[in-house]
């Protein structure tokens, strides 16, 4: 729920964005919402290996196409695990995440006493 709220606030200025949650398969969500394609960002070749397999399964199982976008080089190393670890040890992640996420990470670190 916290992630949903942060994403909603971060994208509030974008009129064509809808933030939603789904507990099943992404292709089932797509079918339920008349979505014909998925756009995924790729950070590295390792992402591509997995995502290509998933795209092929999704296409075969449901007809939903997947398109890939390369991540900007400045962000290609980022992962939620890395950002959380940096924040946990007091690192500055303000240039890596939206302001609201940075504030939430700082609050979580303060609560944990680190």
Annotate each PLM feature.
Residues 1-114:
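Nucleotidyltransferase catalytic core that binds NTPs
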């Amino acid at each position: 729920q916290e992630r949903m709220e942060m994403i909603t606030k971060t994208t509030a200025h974008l009129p064509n964005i809808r933030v939603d949650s789904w507990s099943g398969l992404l292709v089932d969500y797509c079918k339920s919402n008349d979505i014909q394609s998925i756009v995924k960002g790729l950070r590295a070749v390792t992402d591509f290996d997995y995502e290509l397999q998933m795209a092929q399964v999704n296409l075969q199982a449901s007809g939903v196409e997947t398109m890939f976008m390369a991540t900007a080089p400045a962000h290609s190393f980022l992962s939620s695990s890395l950002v959380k670890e940096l924040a946990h040890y007091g690192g500055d992640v303000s240039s890596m995440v939206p302001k609201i996420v940075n504030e939430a990470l700082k609050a979580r670190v303060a609560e944990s006493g680190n």
